[in-house]
Each structure stands twice: as structure tokens, then as C-alpha cells.
Amino acid sequence: MRVIVADCSAEYSGRLNASLPLAKRVLLIKADSSLLIFSELGSYKPLNWMTAPCTIREIDPAAKSAQHSRESVAGGAVDGDSATHSPESVAAGEPEKVLRVSADKGSDILEVTLQHIYSDQTYDLGEDPGLIKDGVEDHLQRYLAEQIERIGKGAKLVRREYPTAIGPVDIMAVNAEGEHVAVEIKRHGGIDGVEQLTRYCELLNRDPLLAPVHGIFAAQTITPQAQVLAKDRGFTCLILDYDDMKGTEDDSLRLF
């Protein structure tokens, strides 16, 4: 990973045209040659970037300036010294580097002019193990299966990922009365999740060996619209407290 801190400007051309005026910014250049430009404030997203596959080259600023001069003279736009230096470039002086990044699959070009470089360092970050997500639906499913009485006292687990013709139900259990309960689990429960649970329950209730099958819609958060729809369909909503399920002291359970 190459990290450059510099006063820079940038021009992007291709599918769209965009420019960044001269300012102090951070540039990240990855091993795949992708380049990202960041500012101090604003979004976590870069101001401009070129992603792989791409090719990056360092252009000699003097050669670029000379080429620009020849093109200006050939075009008859201006003559003399004014052809080579605008008032802004005279004030700023010659840039230290020019980076040109070209898309390998297209005509897009990002050209970054580094007017003054404060730092230019390269680091070997090694192989990254990747992001390990905590609190995803699979974790919620596993914890709820291990603590199945959260859906009701006396409940027993039948199995996780209970197979059906239209896809697996997250959890199938039986309640204290011995009736089957299908549990659909989401991190953030919306109307789509309730509709999914509805399809499962309608299918499962056609099987005389399983019916009646009740439905529980379980999530860390459930939208008000989803709560209303679930209640209308005869389902129970269960709010899952992930920290609690991992073993924190608060063992409260909210059913509504």
C-alpha cells in the first residue's frame, strides 16, 4: 500500500468528466494499481478513484508541460510564454509528480497532479484475513437454537434450516403444547421477512403431520409496518438482543 500526502489536483475523463481543484489530500495506491483520493472531512468514500483493473504511470511533469505548450501553440490559442504558463501555474510552480491511471477495460483516465508532496510511503500490509462479521443472521440463528426457550417456555428445537420446497426455514421448533413453530430470523425485520414467513407457514400447514404450524418473526429490530402485518397474519414478533444472547447479564425477553 502506497500512501501519499500531497497538495494535489485531479482530472477524471471517460464515462464522466470531473475535476478536483488544488488542495491537500491523501492518496492510497493499492497493489492492484487502484488509486483513491481522500480529503480530511466528508464521507468515508473517496473524492475520486480508479478501481482495478487499471494501469498507473508516473508522467514527467516537465515533459507534460512541454507537450501542453506544443499543443497550445499548434492550436493557435496563445503565443509566447503565456502558452506554457497560466497565472495559477506560475504561482504554484512545477508539480513534483503527475500520476496517470488508465482503465484497462475502457477509456477512463484519472490524472492526478501532485504539486507538493509532504509524504510518500509504501507499506507491505501482507495478506488480510478478511472481515469477520458479528451479529449476522447465522449467529442469531445459532444462539436462538441453543436458547430455544426464548420463543416460549417448554419449547424444544427440531432443527435449524428446516428444509421445505421453497427454501429452508431458519428454525423449526415445537412449543410446550407439542405444536410446531416456524421461526424466521432477520437482523432488521421488514415486511419482506413477514411475507417470507407467511409463505413458509402456508406451505407447512398443508402437511397434516405438521399442522398447526405457528409463526414467529424474530429480529434485532422490526419496523412498525412489519409488526402490524405480522400481527395481522397471526404471527408473534420476537426482539432478539444479541448481546444478551451472547451471555450478558440482562436476560429480559420481549414478546409482543
Curated annotation (Swiss-Prot):
Q: Name one GO molecular function term.
A: single-stranded DNA endodeoxyribonuclease activity
Instruction: State the superkingdom.
Output: Bacteria
Q: Which UniProt keywords apply?
A: Cytoplasm, DNA-binding, Endonuclease, Hydrolase, Nuclease
Cellular-component GO terms for this entry: cytoplasm
Q: According to its UniProt record, where is this protein mainly located?
A: cytoplasm
- E.C. number(s) listed in UniProt: 3.1.-.-
Q: Name one Pfam family in it.
A: NucS_N
NCBIfam families assigned to the protein according to its UniProt record, in alphabetical order = PRK03298.1
Say which family it is in.
Answer: Belongs to the NucS endonuclease family.
Name of the protein this chain belongs to: Endonuclease NucS
Give the species this sequence originates from: Bifidobacterium longum (strain NCC 2705)
